[in-house]
């Protein structure tokens, strides 16, 4: 997007936007978290294309970026699978053609229609948008590898997504338990019952049909319909939702296992989901890490540390009393908080660099927020994760690393304004370079 910014007024500038659409399509096949870069991209576009910048305009740009994410995530991705399923049923169950004929025909028709529309419509905005949609679709077809691999019947073929219907289930991650986001059940919620004759049954909402191929008849058959259980005692912003983890929630809130209050719900959100499952990982990278043993809240495993003894001992107890295996752990890295301080200075310096600096800050902030805290809100994680989840927030750490670089430039700029001595500026630059040197020497053994 920065290359587009440099060439946005040229004849070929829009090619960078089309390339971005293609990369987003490819990223769908890697991980959906890549879509969270869209708000930062849209803000760069807004700042470049509009001379008059206003808070209302920024809010509109952010809203449009949110709509783009919603379109790709909840309309485009499942919609392509749905339409492919309709074609598959028509061609196989009605026309009697072989399996996958409908899906292949749908993809061919999609590309034909998009190519025809690109040739027919020449207005710049519409033409570029159609190219973006085509490239998004081309990137999305990387999921064909999943179908091909599943049909090869490899030894490891979990959930066997060998047709469009099982592929849709795979894309929707239906093998995992879904977590409520804004409103829903808690771990103490009971199923809702409704009368049925002389008995009561659990109230459910009927979902879509589940199809499976019958290879003997050469057709798809409905084996069941999806059902969602309706619960009573729902709450807003439910964070403590999994009945399997009722006792684990108590460890983080100190509450009871009967029914969580909203206070306990928010306590869990702050102490576990925010502090333990995000800020702890953030501080690992920019302050220091105790060891690489997965922790569950205990003071000796997987915490962040500074390397400043009195401060670490105050938080976690006397670190010198830890067993030798933990003190000599290769994941023990101390940065003394220097990268964090330099990054915070970078934020301060960027924000105070007039109007342009504030615009740049907003782009980086939304990249930082959307690839960090927004993921925390969306995942709604339960205690006892099978592994550390720091990898999920790599984009957020990348954004803060940019602020560290800006902080180094800001320090040099600030000193240059106060002195003309090249020696002093050189000394400061050397000090700034010592920070990544310290990080490299500390983390080399964990990554060797």
Annotate the PLM regions.
Residues 12-15, 51-63, 94-104, 119-134, ...:
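Membrane-interfacial entry segments at the cytosolic side of transmembrane helices
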Residues 385-410:
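Hydrophobic/aromatic-rich transmembrane helices and adjacent perimembrane loops
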Residues 17-29:
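Membrane-interface alpha helices of multi-pass inner-membrane proteins
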Residues 150-347:
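Lumenal/periplasmic acceptor-binding loop at the mouth of the active site in multi-pass
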Residues 33-45, 105-110, 408:
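Transmembrane-embedded, aromatic-rich helix segments that form part
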Residues 1-16, 45-54:
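Membrane-interface transmembrane helices that cradle and orient dolichyl/undecaprenyl
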Residues 137-147, 424-448:
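Transmembrane alpha-helical segments
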Residues 109-119, 336-356, 410:
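Hydrophobic, aromatic-rich transmembrane alpha-helices
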């Amino acid at each position: 997007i920065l290359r587009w910014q440099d060439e946005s007024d040229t004849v070929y500038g829009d090619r960078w936007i089309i390339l971005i659409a293609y990369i987003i399509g490819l990223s769908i096949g890697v991980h959906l978290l890549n879509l969270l870069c869209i708000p930062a991209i849209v803000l760069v576009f807004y700042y470049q294309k509009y001379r008059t910048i206003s808070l209302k305009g920024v809010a509109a740009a952010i809203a449009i970026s949110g709509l783009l994410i919603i379109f790709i995530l909840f309309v485009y991705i499942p919609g392509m699978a749905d339409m492919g399923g309709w074609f598959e049923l028509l061609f196989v169950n009605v026309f009697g053609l072989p399996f996958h004929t409908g899906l292949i025909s749908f993809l061919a028709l999609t590309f034909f229609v998009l190519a025809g529309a690109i040739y027919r419509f020449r207005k710049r905005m519409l033409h570029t948008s159609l190219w973006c949609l085509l490239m998004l679709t081309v990137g999305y077809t990387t999921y064909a590898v999943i179908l091909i691999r599943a049909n090869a019947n490899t030894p490891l073929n979990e959930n066997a997504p060998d047709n469009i219907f099982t592929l849709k289930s795979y894309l929707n991650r239906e093998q995992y338990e879904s977590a409520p986001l804004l409103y829903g059940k808690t771990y103490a919620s009971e199923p809702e019952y409704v009368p049925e004759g002389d008995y009561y049954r659990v109230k459910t909402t009927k979902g879509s049909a589940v199809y499976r191929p019958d290879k003997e008849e050469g057709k798809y058959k409905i084996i069941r319909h999806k059902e969602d259980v309706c619960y009573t005692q729902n709450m807003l912003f439910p964070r403590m939702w999994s009945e399997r983890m009722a006792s684990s929630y108590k460890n983080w809130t100190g509450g009871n296992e009967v029914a969580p209050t909203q206070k306990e719900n928010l306590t869990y959100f702050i102490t576990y989901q925010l502090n333990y499952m995000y800020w702890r990982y953030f501080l690992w990278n920019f302050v220091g890490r105790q060891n690489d043993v997965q922790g569950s809240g205990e003071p000796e495993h997987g915490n962040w540390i500074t390397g400043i003894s009195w401060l670490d001992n105050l938080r976690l107890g006397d670190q010198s009393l830890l067993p030798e295996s933990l003190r000599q752990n290769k994941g023990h890295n101390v940065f003394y908080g220097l990268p964090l301080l330099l990054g915070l200075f970078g934020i301060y310096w960027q924000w105070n660099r007039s109007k342009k600096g504030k615009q740049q800050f907003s782009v980086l902030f939304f990249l930082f927020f959307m690839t960090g805290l927004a993921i925390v809100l969306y995942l709604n994680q339960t205690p006892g994760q099978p592994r550390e989840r720091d990898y999920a927030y790599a984009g957020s750490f990348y954004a803060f690393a940019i602020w560290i670089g800006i902080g180094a430039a800001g320090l040099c700029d600030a000193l240059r304004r106060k002195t003309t001595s090249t020696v002093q500026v050189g000394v400061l630059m050397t000090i700034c370079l010592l920070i990544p040197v310290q990080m490299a020497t500390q983390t080399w053994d964990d990554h060797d």
